[in-house]
Amino acid sequence: MLRSVWNFLKRHKKKCIFLGTVLGGVYILGKYGQKKIREIQEREAAEYIAQARRQYHFESNQRTCNMTVLSMLPTLREALMQQLNSESLTALLKNRPSNKLEIWEDLKIISFTRSIVAVYSTCMLVVLLRVQLNIIGGYIYLDNAAVGKNGTTILAPPDVQQQYLSSIQHLLGDGLTELITVIKQAVQKILGSVSLKHSLSLLDLEQKLKEIRNLVEQHKSSSWINKDGSKSLLCHYMMPDEETPLAVQACGLSPRDITTIKLLNETRDMLESPDFSTVLNTCLNRGFSRLLDNMAEFFRPTEQDLQHGNSMNSLSSVSLPLAKIIPIVNGQIHSVCSETPSHFVQDLLTMEQVKDFAANVYEAFSTPQQLEK
């Protein structure tokens, strides 16, 4: 039996060698293919896990953004009420002073200024914090992903994070003061000559707010000239035009200072982008729309109006004397700058444009390839 097999192999030696080579090649290719498939599967699994981890970190970061905004609103409200103290004027009016008309005129300007500044500053706070916390969030994600790797440098240590995020104080300090000045001038120009007895409908109020917005947003200090000659909406109030005090020092900067300056410059680039201006403008449109919605309940038709079958547009069918509108406007700050999630703040925090913009910022700063560009 063995001899006959051996004779067969000798007679078909070349064929057997060829067949053995083919079978061996198929076996090796099969093993190689299995290895490659396993490597691809492992790589895809690792990428999926990394993507899921990054998505989880992003969503957690957005919750942090929302909580940070809500936690800072009382500080913003207090700063506004301190600089635009209408309560002191209201207290004076209760004593029936001889200059009552003059005080009412001051109250008119301060009340409108305060509510309009509240809308602007709250919108700025929401969008600016989205930028800052997603930039720093991207760096933190990369730092966490690099834990355990040799030769890696922490991109955003805690002290840098604290120093960088403290730059929000410009919006709550000097930036807010400048914004108040500009808006107060615009309010004075549009409403200064309007009599307290003059009646305004909700539609009239909307038109007045549009006129004030146009003056504010076209003001020379409200537009930031970018490197390409374009203008960024209201960025001046969120970050100072001049170099940061750290950069002015020129020498003697610590590694922490250098990293902080890098983060601030990256933030500045984001604020100069067309996307930022678009998102901020969308927030402002929503904010002023919500402000009017809040006041609309005071302009509801009376039963007498309804009995007369008033078919006019509800926005213009009811008018109130300006003197009665002032207290309504004056109280809006408590809704706009409420740390308890109100419809106003919730609208801003849940806007799709804000979410998409935040995702783009986070994507840019949580991807190593993007940071290397």
Swiss-Prot record:
Subcellular location: Peroxisome membrane
Region Interaction with PEX19: start-end pairs: 120-136
Pfam family, one: Peroxin-3
Keyword Nucleus: no
Peroxisomal side: 37-116
GO biological-process terms attached to the record: peroxisome organization; protein import into peroxisome membrane
UniProt keyword annotation of Metal-binding present: no
GO molecular function: lipid binding; protein-macromolecule adaptor activity
Ranges that cross the membrane: 16-36, 117-140
Keywords, comma-separated and alphabetical: Membrane, Peroxisome, Peroxisome biogenesis, Transmembrane, Transmembrane helix
Membrane topology listed for this record: Multi-pass membrane protein
Region described as Targeting to peroxisomes: 1-45
UniProt-listed InterPro entries: Peroxin-3
Cytoplasmic side: 1-15, 141-373
Gene Ontology cellular component annotations, sorted alphabetically: endoplasmic reticulum; nucleoplasm; peroxisomal membrane; peroxisome; protein-lipid complex
Assembly description: Interacts with PEX19.
Entry function: Involved in peroxisome biosynthesis and integrity. Assembles membrane vesicles before the matrix proteins are translocated. As a docking factor for PEX19, is necessary for the import of peroxisomal membrane proteins in the peroxisomes.
UniProt family annotation: Belongs to the peroxin-3 family.
PANTHER family, A to Z: PEROXISOMAL BIOGENESIS FACTOR 3 (PTHR28080:SF1)
Protein name (database record): Peroxisomal biogenesis factor 3
Source species: Macaca fascicularis
